[in-house]
Amino acid sequence: MINDELTAAFNAKPRVDINNIKKMTPGQLDQVKNYGSMAENLLKNKNFALFVHHYKFDMSDAVVGIAGHNEEDNARRLSIVHNIAGIDRFVEFLQNAVRFKNMAVNIQSPVNTKGNINE
């Protein structure tokens, strides 16, 4: 069942075109920065990193534990490998959010990292 908290979390997702980051309004840039900060906090959390690595090790052990070579065993192996790839894609998603946050900060700063004044 969808509750108000879930709806608020879904609506908090920034709906901006990252490909046109230089044309964003200050409000949109603030959304990107807030979202990126949340992602950065997750990536810096040692407990989160520990659980991600434990999950990947657990999945790797599950793959090694499949001894058979029939179609069902191969399908289980493939499913587990997709789970491992999924967690890697999630971490990449978080890293991209941080990268976009850094781009937004650079755009809003009066002097960018190259020493040029932003107009």
Sequence positions of predicted segments:
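Intrinsic-disorder/low-complexity detector
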Residues: 1-119
